[in-house]
Amino acid sequence: MDKELFKEEQRFDQLWLKVPLYILAIGNVVLFAYGFYHQLIVGEPWGDNPMSDIGLVFATGLVFLIWGAVFFLFEKTKLITSIYDKEIRIRFPPFFSKEKTIPIQMIKKMEVRKYNPITEFGGWGLRYGFRGKAYNVKGNIGLQLNFKNGKNLLIGTQKGEQVKWAISKMVRAD
């Protein structure tokens, strides 16, 4: 039985990210709800060049659907990292719900490092950059894995010191 040394679950819960999204969503929904009400309930065309009633129903539904999907993704997306004595396991639902297992034998080098998510990977999330793949949701600290096959993976963490401790125990367990 593998011994779990570390586990972390991270979500996209940054206020600087949520506030603009909520403002945009509320603005879009209110605008289309007003247009829907004005044209279909009151009976007056909405705007200088109004779309058909069917087009407005479709567009309003699409706006609600898109924003619903965005908020669903933000609510359900989480990065789950587990470090065991002989492997690292990662899940990033809804992008991949099946656990990815990385045996220690595949890893050439691993270290906790500071990184720049924007310049190195183009932001947060499931990212691809010149230095390899990154799974991150916030911050600028990550577990850098360099594989024996030449590929690289960075896993973001908010608990760098705990990850350092876990990988030191992991290496000793091999």
Give the role of each language-model region:
Residues 1-54, 169:
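N-terminal membrane-targeting/pre-transmembrane regions
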Residues 52-54, 59-60, 78-80, 116-117, ...:
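Short, flexible segments with low predicted structural confidence
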Residues 16-28, 48-57, 85-97, 152, ...:
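Short N-terminal helix-initiation segments at or just after the protein's N-terminus
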